[in-house]
UniProtKB/Swiss-Prot annotation:
PANTHER family in the record: TRNA-DIHYDROURIDINE SYNTHASE (PTHR11082), TRNA-DIHYDROURIDINE(16) SYNTHASE (PTHR11082:SF26)
Residues with site note (Interacts with tRNA): 35, 95, 176, 272, 274, 279, 295
Keyword RNA-binding listed: yes
Catalytic activity as recorded in UniProt: 5,6-dihydrouridine(16) in tRNA + NADP(+) = uridine(16) in tRNA + NADPH + H(+); 5,6-dihydrouridine(16) in tRNA + NAD(+) = uridine(16) in tRNA + NADH + H(+)
Originating species: Vibrio parahaemolyticus serotype O3:K6 (strain RIMD 2210633)
Protein name: tRNA-dihydrouridine(16) synthase
């Protein structure tokens, strides 16, 4: 089985990739999207979103990182794919699945699912532009509204020469509703097409992963949101590990405080750790108590101080029980 840590715009940056690949056996990571409009972006944009380019396009633990591009103009997508490759990208991933309204309004992401011919043009332009040894992949949803549209979309991508395709098994209109997941369509795609597939959507534990593999016939899986709910989800899905216990999550939150973004004026950790709590609270009820203590702070120092104090009290309670 292969497990990929998927992209999450505004959430899964290089620091989170570093942390999550240190504690999980992921096979691949994909960056947040590089938004392409009508120019070749300056190098600092690629390095900001993928600083791993300066260390062999891999995380510090050695997991390959592919650069994700989002746009609808074939020429400029290809030109930026070339630049990413020149900067050392191990792979180029094309985003045709982002459901965000602002992205779709500007004709990016999932909006292109309504235009398979344009998807074909973008993929072909990028595939023709970069060296053959650099894979060009794509990520889609099943369609804008009708999942039956997936076959025309996949045909457009495969015929354009893409090396791999991730399928999020919901339509754009299906959002993130569990009831809208349609893994069976990935199986239908696998039966009709030869392009290698990665299955994505509603994989929250080992059992989900196994059911997805059984339903789709695909043994490459991508996890995204769940990786923030339970930090060791990659190992749960791949190796049937038990969920990380809450005390270890607290240690991870403290470890996260050691990272800081250059030039962010000390706001990185407070903003991102609160964002992380929004996910943790869905899987760890204990997170609610700790979040209430830190939510009004906007500096890293008092947040870390409170988390450390909470950890010490937690360890004290655990030792008394033992």
């Amino acid at each position: 089985m292969r497990v990929v840590l998927g992209p999450m715009e505004g959430v899964l940056d290089h620091l989170m990739r570093q942390i999550l690949t240190e504690i999980n056996d992921y096979d691949l990571c994909v960056t947040e999207f590089v938004r392409v409009i009508d120019q070749v972006l300056p190098d600092h944009v690629f390095h900001r979103l993928c600083p791993e380019l300066m260390q062999g396009s891999q995380t510090t633990s050695g997991v390959p990182v592919h650069v994700q591009l989002l746009g609808q103009e074939p020429h400029w997508m290809a030109e930026n794919a070339i630049r990413a490759a020149e900067l050392g990208a191990r792979g180029i991933d094309l985003n045709f699945g982002c459901p965000a309204k602002m992205v779709n309004k500007s004709k990016g992401g999932a909006a292109l699912l309504q235009h398979p011919e344009l998807i074909h043009s973008v993929v072909k332009a990028c595939r023709d532009a970069v060296p053959a040894n650099i894979p060009v992949s794509a990520k889609i949803r099943l369609g804008w509204e009708n999942p039956e549209d997936c076959f025309e979309i996949v045909d457009a991508i495969q015929s354009a020469g893409a090396n791999e395709l991730t399928v999020h098994a919901r339509t754009k209109q299906g959002g993130y509703k569990a009831s809208e997941i349609k893994w069976e369509y990935i199986n239908k795609i696998r039966e009709r097409f030869s392009i290698p597939l990665i299955a994505n959507g509603e994989i929250w534990n080992f059992e989900d992963g196994q059911r997805c593999i059984e339903t789709t016939g695909v043994d490459s899986l991508m996890v995204c949101r769940g990786a923030f709910n339970i930090p060791n989800l990659g190992n749960m899905v791949k190796h049937n590990h038990t969920p990380m216990v809450w005390s270890d999550v607290v240690d991870l939150l403290i470890y996260y405080s050691k990272f800081e973004m250059k030039g962010d004026k000390g706001l990185y950790y407070p903003n991102r750790v609160k964002q992380w709590f929004a996910y943790l609270r869905q899987s760890y009820p204990e997170a609610n108590e700790l979040f209430r203590e830190i939510r009004t702070f906007n500096k890293a120092a008092p947040i870390v101080e409170h988390i450390q104090r909470y950890r010490d009290e937690l360890q004290s309670r655990q030792s008394q029980v033992a």
